[in-house]
Amino acid sequence: MVEIDQKFALSTPTGLGGNFPLKHDAPKGKHVCFVDNGNQYTELFRQGVKQATTALGWRLTVIQADQNVASSYGSAVTSSAQAGCDGVIMPSAQYANYQSQVPGAAKRGMVIVDANSSNKVGKGVVKVLSASKLQYYEGAATANVVLKHMAEHHPKGDVTIQTVMVPQFENVFKPILDGFKRQIAVGCGARCKVYTVNDDLSVATGPNPSAPFVAALQRNPETDYMIQSGVTDSGLVAALQQAGLKVPAIIGTAPLQSQLRDLQSSHPTTVAWVAQPFITYGWFMVDGLVRYWADDKPYDPWAHLPDVKWALYPSNVKDFVDGGQSAFPKGYQQLFESMWKI
């Protein structure tokens, strides 16, 4: 029997999950730096940050980092300080990669927003969208999508599941895996065997990104489910078919444009994707700075709320996708502007 914990059930994303007006008006004339490491998710975050800073009348400078070079994040903090930024948004980076630059930034009066990570950070750093909570919830919600599919297609017998870990982004992937594995254990018990494929970033972004998954399915050819991330899914189905392997049911998290297009095609190759509105996340990141500067006791009001996400299937994907990207909740810009009193 498959059990689904409703605590992690997905619901239609009609709002941000709360309404938290500022105590004081949002400040004017701020200069914000955004660290762009070239990752496809970061590019989407940047779009939201651009929208939000424009709405506030703030200046935005984009500072480049290299996701394959750990030291580039610290250099990005230094460059942000040299550019005269009042705040810098650092998405999905390991804290150790820029920790040594934090004291110098604080002395200059520059605050750092650590966004979308599970880092434990020190003074001078504001956490927004903590992956310890939000990505854990994402993993558990993804497990519920799997359990629902299992109830229909694998009501009895053992089930083999392959998941993915990208070591360079462990602070994001680990909470997802923790939430997923716990929820699968609760809902499926000993029936489900969960394995994890280590997909190094250099391979995931290289000429043969599917090699680790092909090898994993060669070891376990009867795999029933492959849990993917949008950034690791490139060319997976074609690679498995070319290797003569059975293509398992693919359920993923954080789809990018190629996965969303696939869901909308006449013959989708994946079952479902638990989607996050990454452009909206950029607004959350700017919200962290707004509250830091405007409120007497700044805090992240979103830290204890369920993440904004939805399970996208071929049957409903068109309801939640706008211009090739997940765009929800509807009117999110106006919701933030109302809280910011602009």
Predicted regions and their residues:
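Extracytoplasmic "Venus flytrap"
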Residues: M1-G48, A52, T61-G74, S79, ...
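Hinge/cleft segment of the Venus flytrap/periplasmic-binding protein
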Residues: M1-K28, I184, P277-I342
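Hydrophobic alpha-helical segments within soluble ligand-binding/sensing domains
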Residues: G17-G18, S130-T160, P175, P209-S210, ...
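Structural recognition of the beta-strand scaffold that forms the well-ordered cores
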Residues: V32-V35, T42, T61-I63, G87-P91, ...
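Short, solvent-exposed amphipathic alpha-helices that sit
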Residues: Y41-A55, E138-V145, N171-K193, N208, ...
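Short beta-strand elements in bilobed, periplasmic/extracellular small-molecule ligand-binding domains
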Residues: T54-Q67, T160-T163, I184-P207
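Hydrophobic alpha-helical
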Residues: V88-K107, F180, N198-D262
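Flexible loop/hinge segments that line or gate small-molecule binding clefts
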Residues: S100-Y137, T160, Q257-S265, T269
